[in-house]
Amino acid sequence: KTAFLTTVLLSLAMHNRVENLNFYILDFGNSGLIPLNRLHHTADYISFDDTERFRKFCNLIQAEIKRRKKLLAERMVQNFEVYNQVAEKTLKAIVIAIDNYDVVKELGYEAEEFFQKLSRDGTGLGIYMAATATRSNAMKYSTYNNFKNKVAGYLFDESDLHVIVGRSSYSQSEIKGRTLIKYNGLVSVM
């Protein structure tokens, strides 16, 4: 999971300038994302036990959501992409990467609620989430449904596979690194 998230973030960093993209890395796993803290794109790196920093991050993102909603309303545009086409000063895309989402429940109800609202409202505002988890039920269903694209690696329980990508003719591969991907409603094997 950590290697997958690392690959996603490095790929985004390679294809986007710092002026256009920032990362907020929430490393709730084994601290495997620490090296990404050196990327110029990384605005902040937060580990699981840094509760004060996490609280400040939540406040910062909530304020940014309000600011972006106001900017889009002033320009009378429906989303981040259209805003950046018409605005003189464009907005940066923000990617919030969460490794080991399973532990969010330990952070409390407020954290779960924050991520639910973020996953619902963020995409249209240019604030995107990428999260990893070991179980399909680690994330509330209402939050999970806000993710349009889903990737399932090897899972111990095959029924988790169907929860993540839906029913398909593909089955889980025993080969390490193989995944099932649900992208734009289609399921494929990688």
Locate each region found by the language model.
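P-loop NTPase catalytic phosphate-binding loop
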Residues: 1-78, 85-174, 180-188
